[in-house]
Amino acid sequence: LEVAANATQDEWFYFSPYEGITDYEDIDWYDYFLARGFAVVLSAGIGTNNSEGFETCGSDVEIDAFAAIIEWLTGDRVAYTDKENNIEVKADWSNGSVGMTGRSYAGTTQFGLAATGVEGLKTIVPVSGIASWYDYYNCQGVNIGTDEQIAGLAMYCAGRYINKEDWATIEESYGAYLHQMAEDMFANGNDYNDLAWSNRDYTLGDGFKCSALIVQGLNDYNVRTKQAEMMYNSFKAAGLDVKMLMHQGDHITPTHQDTHAPIP
């Protein structure tokens, strides 16, 4: 609690000049859980603002980084108050039972974590999550997304460019990484290849243990319904409790009051 009291809000609740919004834009939504006795943990991904490393757009490296947070919540990993010292901080308030929810990219990472079988993850409620990054951007060898595909989205989500001094330390090396990512991605044109896509296909995971309530908009033309179906089938194949909630909205969270998406 002492560490939390000394934290500064602008480290995680800040205005993004590139998007024109404040992250996290839906922070009040978590009041629903807090009022019901849950603790809420929000974590930046690797390569994002105030973090380290490269943003890798859904790779196994990114998923493993999020898994480390769950391991900390279950007491299986050590964490420190900041990057410079060795003062350990424990999640002694956590009972080790973790659930996840979130939309779009935050729904996608849930699929990735569920596929790892990380201990402590009991259930997920992903909204408009991506099951396979190849199938998000391509369909049987035809590009149906942006030309840059995962390399472009990785750059967009990097976030470290908000801090110009920090960005200067990785700009050249990260540019080289993105170039290699594009080379791998287009090794077979727009056809699938293991080099870029297999570690971003969460349906291939063999560690599924948790339950899932998968939420998907029938009119979502960003993350299409195929993604929800693919992940539903993976949970079913693993013999797990999985349900789907389909609504008539698009790329939205139907419980948010400002979306006005009716649930049939």
Language model: regions and residue ranges:
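Accessory cap/linker subdomain of secreted extracellular hydrolases
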Residues: E2-E19, D23-Y30, A35, I63, ...
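Catalytic nucleophile-loop/oxyanion-hole region of alpha/beta-hydrolase
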Residues: D23, N49-A68, D76-Y80, H256-I263
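Conserved alpha/beta-hydrolase
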Residues: L34-N50
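Structural recognition of the beta-strand scaffold that forms the well-ordered cores
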Residues: A39-A44, S97-G102, G107, K122-S128, ...
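Short beta-strand/loop motif that positions the catalytic acidic residue
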Residues: F208, I214-Q216, D220
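Conserved alpha/beta-hydrolase "acid-adjacent" motif
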Residues: Y221-E229
